[in-house]
Amino acid sequence: MAMEAARFERTLRTESSEIFTVYGGARRLGRVDVHYGRFEVHGTLILDVELTDDELQQLIDQLDEELVQTHDPEREDFLVTVFKGEELGFYS
């Protein structure tokens, strides 16, 4: 069964990177940091929830289509590192 399409809420943008909170419906799924290099794009995806391999691939494909390709359609590769963790707090 396919996972509901994710929603991405940008929390930060610089000249070469962006940070998005990832939601599935009203539930927070995690966060993704996207860094735009000259020829490739690197993503660090930190999940708050368990996803199946198929759901994870679906999410990565959606990240690529909605965030990466719209920013740089000519890039050669989107490289993603995935972590599973929990947010302990936000400090300033």
Predicted regions: what they are:
Residues 1-24, 28-92:
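Terminal leader/tail segments of proteins
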